Amino acid sequence: MNAQNPYAATFAWMNNEVIPYLDQLPELSHAEFLRKLEAQLAKDLYPVEWGELSAEPTAQSIAAKLQQAVQELIQNHNNTLGQVLYRIDISEGKIRRLMASTTPEKRSEKLAFQLLEREAKKVWLRMNYR
């Protein structure tokens, strides 16, 4: 596992399942998409402190920060987790199924994927239709 990014292996799915949106944005740069994605996540994950936004975020750095933020939400802000998920627009049914079918160790990873997928769609739509 990479010492700089301990979540690199965990988020191997990111390049295959979220980043394809980038191919649909030929006139916009991947870097712009990633900057907007990171900013959207930082905004929507309140009360978790995201930290400083990167001038040049990578998919891996976003994934690592997101995994940490989700873990903090689960451990320290569990009563506001539902509000965050509602604000991001992840269905209650989807979350219930995820929680019931996933081991506690994998919940933050699966939940992070749901958040990332939804936020990436939101950013992609804004970039494509504004």
Q: Could you describe each region identified by the protein language model?
A:
Residues Q67-E109:
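Amphipathic protein-protein interaction modules
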Residues E27, A31, E52, E56-Q60, ...:
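Conserved phosphate/pyrophosphate-binding and hydrolysis machinery centered on Walker-type P-loop NTPases
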Residues M1-A42:
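N-terminal leader/targeting peptides and immediately adjacent processing regions
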Residues I95-R130:
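Amphipathic alpha-helical binding modules
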Residues Q40-Q83:
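Amphipathic alpha-helical interaction modules
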